[in-house]
Structures are given as structure tokens and as C-alpha cells.
Amino acid sequence: MPHTPDAPLTLYATARCGYCRRLKRAMDQAGIGYREVDVERDAEAAELVEYINGGYRLVPTLVFADEEVLVNPTVDEVRAQLASMSPTPSVAPGR
């Protein structure tokens, strides 16, 4: 499920980042889909990551569909954020 264009999260990374490779491997093994953007090849993405991180190009940076941001998270933190985004089933009144 990795590298999914319409995934609920975007992974900003670099090819030579060991933390990025570790996180991608863990998300791949967990079946978590994501869109990957290499900040060394995409100047706009690099600017966004620097803006998010107070002027620093910190990777891996994950941006979720609800605009929540995690920097160098564990796969468990990614799962928790995805779970918090899942819609809660509504219960009809009177039930």
C-alpha cells in the first residue's frame, strides 16, 4: 500500500535519510499508504518542510489530510494519528 497518490498522509523525505528509510520500511510493513515527496528534488516541498519546522529542513516530516504534522514519528504514532482521523460512526437518536 505504500506510495499511494490519494493517501491520507504525505511523507516528506530525502533519499539518503536513514530515519526516512526506517519509517518507510515500517509503514510499508504495516500496510500504511502514503505519498512520498523528496525535498531534495522539490523546492516547494523543501520550503514547506522548513516553514512547518521553524526554518529547519527536518525529515521525515509527515503531513496528514487533517493537516496534523508529525516529525520523525514511530509507526505507532502514525497509526494513532490515522486512527484519530477515522470518522466515528454516528448513532441514530433514541438508540
Where are these regions (language model features)?
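Thiol-based oxidoreductase modules, predominantly thioredoxin-like and allied folds used
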Residues: 32-46, 56
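Short, low-complexity, intrinsically disordered N-terminal peptides in bacterial proteins
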Residues: 1-7, 88-95
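Non-catalytic, surface beta->alpha helical segment in thiol-disulfide oxidoreductase systems
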Residues: 64-94
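Short amphipathic alpha-helix with an adjacent loop that forms part of the alpha/beta core around
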Residues: 49-53, 82
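Short alpha-helical
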Residues: 18, 43-44, 57, 77
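Structural micro-motif
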Residues: 53-62
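Local sequence-structure signature of Cys/Sec-based thiol-disulfide redox active-site neighborhoods
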Residues: 1-33
